[in-house]
Swiss-Prot record:
Source organism: Streptococcus agalactiae serotype III (strain NEM316)
Keyword check for Transport: no
Residues the record lists as binding ATP: 9-17, 115
Record's protein name: Argininosuccinate synthase
PROSITE patterns: ARGININOSUCCIN_SYN_1 (PS00564), ARGININOSUCCIN_SYN_2 (PS00565)
C-alpha cells in the first residue's frame, strides 16, 4: 500500500525545505507554492522541492485572483488593522489556504502541511481557513511540532541533503506579496531600536527620495482602481506598478507594535506603498459620492472587517456579510483623484466624480449661492427641540 499524499505549502525557505525531507518518510509530498506577487525565483523553488524529495511540485500564479477577490474587498473597506496595518500577510493566507485545499482535492491528498511556528498568527489563519473549506482534511505543522532552533534545522538539513539558503545569516523574517512587505525579527524585536535602512526592501528612505514631487491621477470605477494617468491595467498590474512609483518616493513605511491573535505583542515593519496611496485616493472618491449616513456607518463595519481578517476569519459568515454591504456602497464610487507623492507623503490634492454629491452652488459663499438660508431657522428649532425640552424639564 502506498503512502498517503500530503500537500505542503512550500516557500522555498529552510523551514519548508527541511519539512519535505522530514515528511517524505511517511508521506508522498506534493509541494505547492503560490505566486502572490512576491517576486521570488519561482523556477528555482519548483526545482528545489523536487530535488529534496517532493513527488510533485507546483507553482500557481494567483496574483490576479488575489488582487480581485481578496485585496479589492479590503481596499474598498479601507481595512487597516489597529488603524495602521493594511493586512498584507493576513490577506494572502486565505487564498493560499483555498488553493491548498483545491490541490488536495485535485491530487487525492488527505493531509495539508504548513511551515508556521507555534507563536504566530499564520498557523491560525491557515488551519481555520482549511477547516472552513474542508473540515475532513488533516493539517500538520512540522515546525510547530519540532520546536527546533535554527541550528538544529541546519544540522538536519546538512544530514539529509537539503540545500542551505544563501541568505541564512539574514536576521529578518520577511513576507511579501503585491499588497506589501512585512519584516520582523533581528534588531526589530527591540521596539526602542529604530529600524535600520537594511530592513526595508521596496521603498526608498524619504530623505533619499526625489526632491521634486510627482503627481499621478488614479481612476476608480465602482470602487475599483482601473487606471493610473489614464492608462488602464489589471488590478494586480496597477498595484505592482504603483508599488514602484510610490516606493521610490518613500511612501508606505509603517512601524507598528501590534496585538497578535495569539496574545502577544509584536513589532513589525511594513512597506505598503501602493496600499497607502490607493487607500487615501479611494477614501477621497467616497467622500465625494457617498451619502452622509453611509459615510458615517461604513467605518464601523470597516473596523470590524479588519479585525475579522486579521483574526483568521476571512471565510466566516460575518466577513461575507460585511463585504456584501461594502460592495453595495461602491456602485457610485466613480471618479479620479490627483495624488501628490513627495518624500514619504501621499496627499490627495484634487478629485472629481460624475457621481459627486458636492454642489458648488450650495457650498459657495459667493453671489452664486443658491442655498436657502431662510430654511435654517425652522431646521434649527426642530433639531434642537429634544435638547430644549430636556433643559426645561431637568433644569439643564
Amino acid at each position: 500500500m502506498g503512502k498517503e499524499k500530503l500537500i505542503l505549502a512550500y516557500s522555498g525557505g529552510l523551514d519548508t525545505s527541511v519539512a519535505i525531507a522530514w515528511l517524505k518518510k511517511d508521506y508522498d509530498v506534493i509541494a505547492v507554492c503560490m505566486d502572490v506577487g512576491e517576486g521570488k525565483d519561482l523556477d528555482f523553488i519548483h526545482d528545489k522541492a523536487l530535488t529534496i524529495g517532493a513527488i510533485e511540485s507546483y507553482i500557481l500564479d494567483v496574483k490576479d485572483e488575489f488582487a480581485e477577490h481578496f485585496v479589492l474587498p479590503a481596499l474598498q473597506a479601507h481595512a487597516m488593522y489597529e488603524q495602521k496595518y493594511p493586512l498584507v500577510s493576513a490577506l494572502s493566507r486565505p487564498i493560499i489556504a483555498q488553493k491548498l485545499v483545491e490541490m488536495a482535492h485535485q491530487t487525492g491528498a488527505t493531509t495539508i502541511a504548513h511551515g508556521c511556528t507555534g507563536k504566530g498568527n499564520d498557523q491560525v489563519r491557515f488551519e481555520v481557513a482549511i477547516a472552513a473549506l474542508d473540515p475532513e482534511l488533516k493539517v500538520i505543522a512540522p515546525v510547530r511540532e519540532w520546536k527546533w532552533h535554527r541550528e538544529e534545522e541546519i544540522t538536519f538539513a546538512k544530514a539529509n541533503g537539503v540545500p542551505i539558503p544563501a541568505d541564512l545569516d539574514n536576521p529578518y523574517s520577511i513576507d511579501q506579496n503585491l499588497w506589501g512587505r512585512a519584516n520582523e525579527c533581528g534588531v526589530l524585536e527591540n521596539p526602542w531600536n529604530q529600524a535600520p535602512e537594511e530592513a526595508f526592501g521596496i521603498t526608498k528612505s524619504p530623505e533619499e527620495a526625489p526632491d521634486c514631487a510627482e503627481y499621478i491621477d488614479i481612476t476608480f470605477q465602482n470602487g475599483k482602481p482601473i487606471a493610473i494617468n489614464n492608462q488602464e491595467m489589471t488590478l494586480a498590474d496597477l498595484i505592482l506598478s504603483l508599488n514602484e512609483i510610490a516606493g521610490k518616493h518613500g511612501i508606505g513605511r509603517i512601524d507598528h507594535v501590534e496585538n497578535r491573535l495569539v496574545g502577544i505583542k509584536s513589532r513589525e515593519i511594513y512597506e505598503c506603498p501602493a496600499a497607502m496611496v490607493l487607500l487615501a485616493a479611494h477614501k477621497e472618491i467616497e467622500d465625494l459620492t457617498l451619502v452622509r449616513e453611509v459615510s458615517h456607518f461604513k467605518p464601523i463595519l470597516e473596523n470590524e472587517l479588519s479585525n475579522l481578517i486579521y483574526n483568521a476569519l476571512w471565510f466566516s459568515p460575518a466577513t461575507k456579510a460585511i463585504i456584501a454591504y461594502v460592495k453595495e456602497t461602491q456602485k457610485v464610487v466613480n471618479g479620479t483623484t490627483k495624488v501628490k507623492l513627495y518624500k514619504g507623503s501621499a496627499k490627495v490634492v484634487a478629485r472629481h466624480s460624475s457621481n459627486s454629491l458636492y454642489d458648488e452652488n450650495l457650498a459657495t459663499y459667493t453671489a452664486a449661492d443658491n442655498f436657502d438660508q431662510d430654511a435654517a431657522v425652522g431646521f434649527i428649532k426642530l433639531w434642537g427641540l429634544p435638547t430644549q425640552v430636556n433643559a426645561q424639564v431637568n433644569k439643564g
